Amino acid sequence: YDAPSARVVDAAGADLILVGDSVAMVVLGYDDTLQVTIEDMRHHVAAVARTRPSSLVVGDMPWMSYHVSREDTVRNAASLVRAGAGCVKLEGGKKRVEAVQAILDIEIPVMGHIGLTPQSVHALGGFKVQGKELDAARMIVDDAVPRADAGCFAIVLEAVPDGVARMITDSIEVPTI
């Protein structure tokens, strides 16, 4: 989220530095990630990018920065790249494929994020493991393939059971984190 941390992570040899919307909870003191804005994210991406890391800087697109229109999605993704991100990450499954494609159309690489998606914390019933029940596990697996097929170069699997993560990893051609 900041230059000192970025220097440490880069020196440790990390392949990427995710400047996450979790900055809302970790640094800014909010109870969830819904309060962080695109302006906040630009600020933190720029702080990390100014260290000129060899690690890929991933700018997390906050809630409502890619939910309203294609134009907003493109403008917000481009603003994170202008701040120094090499790519962007956005949450959600099949219903976010259009947003992924809009960003890829302007040649910005996209990382996906499924499972526990903190921007949907209220819809998911809180911060808890997703996919423990069979139907929920199927939904997560079904969300992974369209994201990979849409062009995401990697997909974050957050708070899903090991078996579900294995199924997803085995069913798509892109790396899972």
Language model features with spans:
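Alpha/beta enzyme core
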Residues: Y1-I177
